[in-house]
């Protein structure tokens, strides 16, 4: 295990909703890959405690989804604060990627970054300012090469680690079928 500025940091957050001014982070996970998308390490998968009054105000979709996948119970049982989860995540990332080297990688990462800026600013600052957003390729493929856009199907568990693994596989799919490096 050694730091490499070419390694990529993949992240996913689960939140109580989409508005960082009203909602909070309830789960965070990270994976580090090399530049060729080979998984080097999985970081801690952390449920972040949030009070019941916040969880009770989630949308019907969030309540249904995060209850069905077990996340609500994990959040209620967790003792972790956002700050503790942030520090554990940074400690993991320091083993693999120098600060400021990797773009934030994943699906719709601009949304995750909004929450990181608000609730985990030191982690937000760990990333390069650029984004590697798989959803950009998904949108382009849907418009420019629709015959491949249905070729990758997600399980949609809405658990952070599962979502990251799917994002990495999805980018590999687009690399093979859409970008075609060879």
Swiss-Prot record:
Its EC number is 3.1.15.-. One of its GO terms (biological process) is DNA metabolic process. Keywords: Cytoplasm, Exonuclease, Hydrolase, Nuclease. This is Oligoribonuclease. The gene is orn. The active site is at residue 129. InterPro entries: Exonuclease_RNaseT/DNA_pol3, Oligoribonuclease, RNaseH-like_sf, RNaseH_sf. GO terms for molecular function: 3'-5'-RNA exonuclease activity; nucleic acid binding. It is found in: Cytoplasm. Belongs to the oligoribonuclease family. 3'-to-5' exoribonuclease specific for small oligoribonucleotides. Residues 8-171 form the Exonuclease domain. SUPFAM superfamilies: Ribonuclease H-like. It is an enzyme of class 3 (hydrolase). GO terms for cellular component: cytoplasm.
């Amino acid at each position: 295990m050694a730091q490499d500025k070419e390694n990529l940091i993949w992240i996913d957050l689960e939140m109580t909703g989409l508005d960082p001014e009203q909602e909070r982070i309830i789960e965070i996970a990270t994976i580090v890959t090399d530049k060729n998308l080979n998984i080097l390490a999985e970081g801690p998968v952390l449920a972040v405690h949030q009070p019941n009054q916040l969880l009770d105000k989630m949308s019907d979709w969030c309540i249904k989804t995060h209850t069905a996948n077990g996340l609500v119970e994990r959040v209620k049982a967790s003792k972790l604060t956002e700050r503790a989860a942030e520090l554990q995540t940074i400690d993991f990332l320091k083993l693999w990627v120098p600060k400021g080297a990797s773009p934030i990688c994943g699906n719709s990462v601009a949304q995750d970054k909004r929450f990181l800026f608000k609730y985990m600013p030191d982690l937000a600052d760990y990333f390069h300012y650029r984004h590697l957003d798989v959803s950009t390729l998904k949108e382009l493929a849907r418009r420019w090469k629709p015959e491949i856009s249905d070729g990758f199907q997600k399980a949609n568990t809405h658990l952070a680690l599962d979502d990251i693994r799917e994002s990495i596989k999805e980018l590999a799919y687009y690399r093979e079928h859409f970008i075609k490096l060879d």
